[in-house]
Amino acid sequence: MTQSIVHVAVGVIIDDSGHVLLGRRLKGTHLAGYWEFPGGKVEPDETVLQALDRELKEELDIRIGATSPLIDVKHDYGDKQVWLDVHRVLEWQGTAKGVEGQPLAWVGIDSLSEFQVPDANAPIMAEVRKLLTSV
């Protein structure tokens, strides 16, 4: 049986003090308890940036402005295949909050390794480390 690939828009948000935003997956979700970059599924009628804006509004109550492509990650979890279409969010409006009840954390480079992330997020973490090192 062929699995379909879930296309996911992901946002890397770094604040002015060089901290990146992570959210914790809620109980009852795939990979519950892991920390991840915010985002969600791209719907058939959306572009990646439309999906990212919608998801960050739903999850964090922020609207995105300028973004730049960061990395594409394809990963097979065995029970699910994902394509993470990752963009750095350069501008946003509002203050991020866990609208869906998810804990949020602004994390500095020295603390990144303390946060357990899904395997598909490992390449994103490597890119974020590069970004935070250059801040």
Task: Give the role of each language-model region.
Residues 1-4, 129-135:
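Generic C-terminal helix-cap and adjacent flexible tail
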Residues 1-20, 41:
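Conserved N-terminal beta-strand and adjoining loop/helix that marks the start
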Residues 15, 63, 72-95, 105, ...:
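Active-site-adjacent beta-strand/loop module that shapes the phosphate/pyrophosphate-binding cleft
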Residues 19-58:
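Conserved Nudix-box catalytic region and its N-terminal flanking loop in Nudix hydrolases
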Residues 59-66:
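Short secondary-structure junctions
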Residues 88, 97-128:
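NUDIX/MutT-family hydrolases
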